[in-house]
Amino acid sequence: MPIQVVSADFAKTATRPEEWPRGATPEIAFVGRSNVGKSSMLNALARRKGLARVSSTPGRTRALQFFDLSYRPTPAARPRAIRFCDLPGYGYAKVARAERDRWTAMIEDYLRDRDVLRAVVLIVDARHPPSESDEDAAAFLVSAGRRLVVAATKTDKLPKARRVLALQQVERALGLARGDAVPFSAVEGTGTDALWARLAALAAEEPQTAEAEPPA
């Protein structure tokens, strides 16, 4: 049964740990290459257009963006709180090196140190094999002890006959079991319920972290 979203609101922007939201609300982070469809995914999950700003300009997100949501896993359940964190996209070459380095440090600090972080959604473009940056991100998250969910976006741009093969390509490249990657299309509205089901289950678990070194 689909998750019922009760409310979804922008919470705050943060660039330093002292600005991160306080409290015990479980968080799910979203990371991926610039222009891979993170904002569209967040809006689809929130059942609210315009919650996260969708831009045609890659690299617009330059800070951590937090969103507070309330949802019911079943119609009879009491509302539960969850927080989404939209991380700056990686792989945007037109950003100055110093700025990219600042983003990288900010993201790595969050992914290592955030004690309420329950899982990270790594978003990849289903039309292409995962990039080296995608593979590095997956390796870093695993080494950090973070629970990883891979979502393959823009499946609507692929012929239906190619979608299964495209997902298998993503899974092989990132070392996932068959069926682990979630196919997602904000245009077709597919994958939202499947992704929500995973995130709600992970939000109910205790956080899990480990010491990590940045990928070489």
From Swiss-Prot:
Binding-site positions, Mg(2+): 39, 61
PROSITE patterns found in the cross-reference section: G_ENGB
Domain of life assignment: Bacteria
GO biological process, one term: division septum assembly
Cofactor: Mg(2+)
SUPFAM superfamilies: P-loop containing nucleoside triphosphate hydrolases
UniProt keyword Cell division present: yes
Domain EngB-type G per the UniProt entry, residue ranges: 24-205
Annotated Gene Ontology cellular component terms: cytosol
UniProt-annotated binding residues for GTP: 32-39, 59-63, 86-89, 153-156, 184-186
Pfam families, per database record: MMR_HSR1
Record's keyword annotation contains Electron transport: no
GO molecular function, one term: metal ion binding
Keyword vocabulary terms for this entry: Cell cycle, Cell division, GTP-binding, Magnesium, Metal-binding, Nucleotide-binding, Septation
Primary role: Necessary for normal cell division and for the maintenance of normal septation.
Family, per entry: Belongs to the TRAFAC class TrmE-Era-EngA-EngB-Septin-like GTPase superfamily. EngB GTPase family.
Protein name (Swiss-Prot/TrEMBL): Probable GTP-binding protein EngB
Species of origin: Anaeromyxobacter sp. (strain K)
